Amino acid sequence: MNYTSFIFAFQLCIILCSSGYYCQAMFFKEIEELKGYFNASNPDVADGGSLFVDILKNWKEESDKTIIQSQIVSFYLKMFENLKDDDQRIQRSMDTIKEDMLDKLLNTSSSKRDDFLKLIQIPVNDLQVQRKAINELFKVMNDLSPRSNLRKRKRSQNLFRGRRASK
């Protein structure tokens, strides 16, 4: 195991416990299992500061925080995917934590979960994928734009005012 893996396991423990959810005994046991496997309790793990906790502290609004959390969860899912292990206990611990992270992030919505997993599996180095992504870029950028929501809000406000004025 390398130093980076140790840090990741330690950060996972911190994120799961500090994200506003209560640590259940089952998940605590699984996290302890991973900490032991990665030797994440070693004092040198703290060298260089935290990976994610300080970033999470910077974001106060729930919607903004959810965006950051989705990136962090994506990171852990990829890390666990790369750490396929023959040790059944460790693999079970990683699978249990993956399930819980996704459930908490996506509020146990199976369709959101499927879409999230589909998105993180898209290979970014594939030329065909890149071509499709560029082709869809304008639509994605429009969807990200707050103007479309502002226009809808203004229209609904004008309709409401019009009804009120006619009474």
UniProtKB/Swiss-Prot annotation:
InterPro entries: 4_helix_cytokine-like_core, Interferon_gamma. SUPFAM superfamilies: 4-helical cytokines. The modification Pyrrolidone carboxylic acid is found at Q24. Released primarily from activated T lymphocytes. Transmembrane segments: none annotated. Keywords: Antiviral defense, Cytokine, Glycoprotein, Growth regulation, Pyrrolidone carboxylic acid, Secreted, Signal. Glycans are attached at N39, N107. GO terms for molecular function: cytokine activity; type II interferon receptor binding. Its main location: secreted. GO terms for cellular component: extracellular space. Residues 1-23 form the signal peptide. GO terms for biological process: adaptive immune response; astrocyte activation; cell surface receptor signaling pathway via STAT; defense response to virus; extrinsic apoptotic signaling pathway; Fc-gamma receptor signaling pathway involved in phagocytosis; humoral immune response; macrophage activation involved in immune response. It is found in: Secreted. Belongs to the type II (or gamma) interferon family. Type II interferon produced by immune cells such as T-cells and NK cells that plays crucial roles in antimicrobial, antiviral, and antitumor responses by activating effector immune cells and enhancing antigen presentation. Primarily signals through the JAK-STAT pathway after interaction with its receptor IFNGR1 to affect gene regulation. Upon IFNG binding, IFNGR1 intracellular domain opens out to allow association of downstream signaling components JAK2, JAK1 and STAT1, leading to STAT1 activation, nuclear translocation and transcription of IFNG-regulated genes. Homodimer. Interacts with IFNGR1 (via extracellular domain); this interaction promotes IFNGR1 dimerization. This is Interferon gamma. The lineage of its organism: Eukaryota, Metazoa, Chordata, Craniata, Vertebrata.
